Amino acid sequence: DPDYLPFLDGADSTERRDGAQNTADAARKAGITSRSVEETLDDNGSPVVTLSPSAVDNLWACPVCWLLENRFAGPRIGSAATSFGTLIHAVAQKGSAEGLDLPGAVAGSSVESAVDAVAHRLVDIYDAIKPDFSSIAKAAERYTAMLKDEQAETTLHNLASYFVESNASSYLNKNEGKFDIGTLESASCEEEFSARFGLDDICMAYNALPGMSPVGRTALMQLMGILVGGWPEGMREDLTVRLSGRIDRKEMRRLRDGSQTIRLIDYKTGRKRQLAEIFNDLQLVCYQLGLMFPEHGRAGERPHSAQSGLFYVQDDAAPASSYSPESAFQPPLFLNGALNAEGFVARDHYPRLDKFTDIPPLPAGKPSALDAVDDNAWQGFLSWNGTQAMWSLTMIARVFYAAAASRSHVIVAHPTRQHKGHCRMTDVCPACAGQVDTVFETRQA
């Protein structure tokens, strides 16, 4: 089927899929290119950095490794494992287009038989579009592809379980009564988005917090710098961030009270991450920012986003699973135009926000470097410590960090603990090899 040719080219990661789509659309969509990071200037001469969501994720994890893999390396060949990921994305999209995820998709059946029927159809779709794995030249790649192929039925049964059971009253298990995900009305798959925002936009959301004494852009930049361990030298207060990519699955759901809400789902077919990584995932953060600051959307639109989650379809039958479905979902960054100041929603086994967050401790006294922050602003900032509002600001600060790091000539690298645990570049990145923090400098003749 020609509609699925883009999924069969060996690309897998969200970044590569975004790049492939952007290349195809370059002639008709100005400003979206195949590069995962690009810098331009706006009409005032201020920098505009365009990033894909996965570039944000990787730059925050370790900017040196990102440079080595993306700026100082040639094109990477797709693997059997990555091709499998894009196949699953294609099957999920086709299944949703056929309405297999809607309530009552299989009429007159029990939940179990409906799951089996939907899984059978998803396997048929998979079999129709998968390539001939026996034709892969390299033996190791051929073996990996065939191994993945054997796992497809289990993976697609997990996907079918979500399609059917997420509309059932028993879906949330021990999270029932703690929060509501509603009933699916429609889903948009592989939806392109582009977002554009700067510190002025974040300042408005920060100052809209209850009881907050307003701060200016310079002060907010200094406060956000505390949350990321200091800014790269490429950070400027007039920096504009532009995000471009595709959302795997955007759901419109109707809640029990009659209100409508949006859920964002990102499919994953690789290694399942640790709990904090799932909750703090920056690709999901980028999708949320795409809803809040659409580049071409109408000003003032603020859609209500409820839960966002990573869906490890090889391991789980629901997104953000931990003990019960959805326990590790990512909460909204914003509510009613402000940073999310609501209390944390307790989940099965996780009654407190600090079970998920990885925010470093804040100093009690105001650092001397924060010369644009007065005492009232500092105390106002500290008053949100340990809340979802501080978590939201931290996640947004990491996106700005990634944008600043991508345009920096000198980078002091502080790789995240999670990245160092599975880094592929330890032979060439001293910071990830467990040595001292690395200063990486690029020079142009």
Residue ranges and their predicted role:
Residues 1-445:
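RecB-family 4Fe-4S metal-dependent nuclease core
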